[in-house]
């Protein structure tokens, strides 16, 4: 059994939607990123890679590589899963906390969980996503960006 932790941050930029957990959410800003900016899937990918001792997403999908420009983070997550399976691991469960003052996440969490479960080839009850604010403190509280903490448990396949 292995545990990994992931953390990612993206700042807001021009745009009218963000993508979190594969779900497109209308918002007054987008997220600045080389890929699609899905900070939730990036943190989950890092947690999974860390648990399997496979480095991090920067190693596997460098932002200096043009092939990952605008990349769909769901595709990247599925690639991470293949890497983990290749090392003899399977996902036990994942848990993530989105830290954002806005937009409100509650209406989208069920859809995020469903897509993540599909991409990780696990049951819905093996995926948890929750959201919190920082009570208007710090960069997320000032609505400058979004942060996500994620934890993954891997089991021998």
Curated annotation (Swiss-Prot):
A divalent metal cation binds at residues 8, 10, 42. One of its GO terms (biological process) is terpenoid biosynthetic process. 4-CDP-2-C-methyl-D-erythritol 2-phosphate binds at residues 8-10, 34-35, 56-58, 61-65, 100-106, 132-135, 139, 142. Binds 1 divalent metal cation per subunit. Its cofactor is a divalent metal cation. The keyword Nucleotide-binding does not apply. CDD domains: MECDP_synthase (cd00554). The record marks 34, 133 as: Transition state stabilizer. GO terms for molecular function: 2-C-methyl-D-erythritol 2,4-cyclodiphosphate synthase activity; metal ion binding. The keyword 4Fe-4S does not apply. Its EC number is 4.6.1.12. Pathway: Isoprenoid biosynthesis; isopentenyl diphosphate biosynthesis via DXP pathway; isopentenyl diphosphate from 1-deoxy-D-xylulose 5-phosphate: step 4/6. Keywords: Isoprene biosynthesis, Lyase, Metal-binding. It catalyses: 4-CDP-2-C-methyl-D-erythritol 2-phosphate = 2-C-methyl-D-erythritol 2,4-cyclic diphosphate + CMP. Homotrimer. Involved in the biosynthesis of isopentenyl diphosphate (IPP) and dimethylallyl diphosphate (DMAPP), two major building blocks of isoprenoid compounds. Catalyzes the conversion of 4-diphosphocytidyl-2-C-methyl-D-erythritol 2-phosphate (CDP-ME2P) to 2-C-methyl-D-erythritol 2,4-cyclodiphosphate (ME-CPP) with a corresponding release of cytidine 5-monophosphate (CMP). Belongs to the IspF family. This is 2-C-methyl-D-erythritol 2,4-cyclodiphosphate synthase. It comes from Pseudomonas savastanoi pv. phaseolicola (strain 1448A / Race 6) (Pseudomonas syringae pv. phaseolicola (strain 1448A / Race 6)). The gene is ispF.
């Amino acid at each position: 059994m292995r545990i990994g932790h992931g953390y990612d941050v993206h700042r807001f930029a021009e745009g009218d939607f963000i993508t979190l957990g594969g779900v497109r959410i209308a918002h007054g800003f987008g997220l600045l990123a080389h890929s699609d900016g899905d900070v939730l899937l990036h943190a989950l990918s890092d947690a999974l890679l860390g648990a399997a001792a496979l480095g991090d997403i920067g190693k596997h999908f460098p932002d200096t590589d043009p092939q990952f420009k605008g990349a769909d983070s769901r595709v990247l997550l599925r690639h991470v899963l293949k890497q983990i399976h290749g090392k003899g691991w399977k996902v036990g469960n994942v848990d993530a906390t989105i830290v954002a003052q806005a937009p409100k996440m509650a209406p989208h969490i069920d859809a995020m969980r469903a897509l993540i479960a599909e991409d990780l080839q696990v049951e819905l009850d093996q995926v948890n996503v929750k959201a919190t604010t920082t009570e208007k403190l710090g960069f997320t509280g000032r609505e400058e960006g979004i942060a996500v903490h994620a934890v993954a448990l891997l089991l021998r396949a």
